[in-house]
């Protein structure tokens, strides 16, 4: 059985590293530290030019929950169209109602735009905040998504093994279950063997020091606990280590 490795990235340096490490598919985001937000059009376009493997754009207009208003949905529709215009292969989204159910009317609107633009669709970890994952899986099957990205309702995929295994059974081949959150070379094989998933998702995150010669510590571009002169990047060796472990 061939296991697919999806790597989530939020910069072009990480895209190159993920490809070098052996990724099979890219989830393109901005702000991975916030769980991943919609990437810019320029980022999408350049990623499409660079990548020899499929690239799916995160469609998430803001951090926080997955309860969206009409303005959010309008922006998401435009972003899906932008992903097609940029030359990407798919998109990643999830929309919930206030009670934790999947918002089927709004999700169907987004699916139609994706389908009209021949884009594949991954339903993301919004399912991990659903009120009933079994009902959610049937909803997602009705929508026609290719896969669900999930940690099995847990803080990480390893802790969610039992639910992930149940999700694979419930999906019953209608779509793939993509196990993500905390996947590493140390646990990927066990997650796969105990759940039956055919795809895993990770960032392979690492950091590198800034190449700036002038380092000014007194001015922050964002949160005070973040070092602006440390750059988060995907480590190609971490991706390759997972690939070698699950062969």
From Swiss-Prot:
Recorded coiled-coil stretches: none
The family this protein is said to belong to: Belongs to the CutC family.
Predominant cellular place of this UniProt entry's protein: cytoplasm
Cell compartments where the protein resides: Cytoplasm
GO terms for cellular component: cytoplasm
Protein name as catalogued: PF03932 family protein CutC
Top-level taxon of origin: Bacteria
Alphabetical UniProt keywords: Cytoplasm
InterPro entries: CutC-like (IPR005627), CutC-like_dom_sf (IPR036822)
Entry keyword rRNA-binding: no
HAMAP family on file: CutC (MF_00795)
GO molecular function: copper ion binding
Pfam families the record matches: CutC
Organism: Aliivibrio fischeri (strain MJ11)
